[in-house]
Amino acid sequence: ENTATVVVDERTDNGDGNFNYNFQTSNGIEDTKTGTPGSQGQSNMQGTFRFLLPDGTTAEVRYVADEFGYRPESPLLPVGPELPPHVHELLRIAEEQRAQGITFE
């Protein structure tokens, strides 16, 4: 469809960093998200967006965006290999050192 119309446009913003957003168009595009204030001064968001693929099926991506970055989830997205066990141990040690105030330059 070359011309889409907005069929739903709902927005709630409490003015304190909390918000809700819901948007839908006549050609199958949907976007919903919820936002809350983050611990680092950022906005934390979680939501879902959907759109129609050329074969008529719906693509869906769920996501979280916060102080740890943007983390989308969808069966359409490629997934990398699992980290080896020793990397998980190194990350745990680094987190302990960070909590103790140890830094490396």
UniProtKB/Swiss-Prot annotation:
Keywords attached to this Swiss-Prot or TrEMBL record, sorted alphabetically, are: Cuticle
Q: Name one GO cellular component term.
A: chitin-based extracellular matrix
UniProt xrefs under InterPro entries: CHIT_BIND_RR_consensus (IPR031311), Cuticle_Struct_Prot (IPR050468), Insect_cuticle (IPR000618)
Which Pfam families does the entry link to? Chitin_bind_4 (PF00379)
Expressed in which tissues: Arthrodial membrane.
Question: Which ranges carry the Chitin-binding type R&R domain?
Answer: 16-81
Question: Keyword Cytoplasm: yes or no?
Answer: no
Q: Keyword Nucleotide-binding, does the record have it?
A: no
Region of interest: Disordered? 25-46
List all membrane-crossing ranges: none
User: Which PROSITE patterns does the entry mention?
Assistant: CHIT_BIND_RR_1, CHIT_BIND_RR_2
Name of this chain's protein: Cuticle protein AM1159
